[in-house]
Amino acid sequence: AKTNIFVFAIYFLLSMGCHAQNIATSELNGTKWKLVSPVSDYCERGMSFTMTTRTTTAKFKKNKKEFQFPLKYYLSSSIPQTFDSSQIGKNRKGSYIIQYVDNSVFWFKIVDISSTKITLLSKLGDTTVYQKVK
């Protein structure tokens, strides 16, 4: 009986680690998010989505200057080897936001999403939490 509990415990931990949220492009379309973790003292960060573009924003508190970084994206259920631009703008379901950065695939895993919050894990290992603005 002890072995069963041990196996179950390991299975439970593994399933937690692999758990990701599936979402459709149409559900992200038109949404706007504000970064709530990690928070910066000098800069407000956010992101917004259209069907084709994920735009990250940085607004500096001191001089109120805002910078926008729009990048094409698509959703995928796994991490692709190459960026498939034919998938941009299609209403796909997936737990990964796939982008093309510096000639290679960059991804964010959607760890959790609710009507008010989204948690992303990046290819670099950073976890960010955003609160929904609209």
Give a label for each model feature.
Residues 1-6:
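Bacterial N-terminal signal peptides that target proteins for export
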